[in-house]
Every structure is written in C-alpha cells, then in structure tokens.
From Swiss-Prot:
Stated role: Involved in the modulation of the specificity of the ClpAP-mediated ATP-dependent protein degradation.
Subunit and partners: Binds to the N-terminal domain of the chaperone ClpA.
Protein name as annotated: ATP-dependent Clp protease adapter protein ClpS
Cross-referenced InterPro entries: ClpS, ClpS_core, Ribosomal_bL12_C/ClpS-like
HAMAP family in UniProt: ClpS
Originating species: Leptospira interrogans serogroup Icterohaemorrhagiae serovar Lai (strain 56601)
Entry-linked SUPFAM superfamilies: ClpS-like
Length: 111
C-alpha cells in the first residue's frame, strides 16, 4: 500500500489516504501443435525463447503433440507478448506454421 498525503489550504488540514495497489496480471504463453512443424524445431524454440532445458522442452513438445497445446510459461504482459512475437518470427524465418498464444492467467483480471 502506498500513502498519499493531501494538504487542503483552505481548511489547513492534512489528510492521509491509503491507496491499494493491484498486482499486474500474469499471462500464460501456450504453444499450439500443428502437423507440419518438426518436433526438433519445437524443442529448439522452447530452449531458445523460453530458456527451457532439453528435457523440459521435450516434455512440453510432447504434451503439445498429444493434447494440441502446452504451457510454455507464465509471464508479465510485455514479456509474454515478446515471447509470442519471437516464436512467430523464428517460425516464419524457418518456414514453419508454428503458433503461440497468450491468455490471462486464471484468477487474474485484465486491466
């Protein structure tokens, strides 16, 4: 909480108000499966963009392959948006249709 002090010059009183700060929302970055992007490329993306170990990357890739999507990580809005853009850019550069999305973490409200 932050304190704000106001001074009213007409009445010459000092008032202290409490302001409750809201935590910023967190966003889930989800990788989506497709039938064209090689599994090794997905593993490489997870290592490069999301800084996952090879074993973690393989687990995430397999989950996306089996269920159609998988969680890459939970980040602030700007970081999540940047990671989605990085995946898009790398996939396009290599000629693959790989996609990522971002969604607000459950229990969080978008501001």
């Amino acid at each position: 909480m932050s304190d704000i002090f106001r001074f009213d010059t007409e009445e010459q009183t000092l008032t202290k108000e409490k302001i409750k700060l809201k935590k910023p929302s967190k966003y889930r970055v989800i990788i989506l499966n497709d039938d064209f992007t090689p599994m090794e490329f997905v593993v490489w993306i997870l290592q490069m963009v999301f800084h996952r170990s090879r074993a973690e990357s393989q687990q995430i890739m397999l989950k996306a392959h089996i269920t159609g999507k998988a969680l890459c990580g939970v980040y602030s809005h700007d970081v999540a948006r940047t990671k989605v853009a990085q995946v898009q850019q790398l996939a396009e550069q290599h000629g693959y249709p790989l996609h990522c999305t971002m969604e607000v973490e459950e229990g969080e409200e978008e501001s």
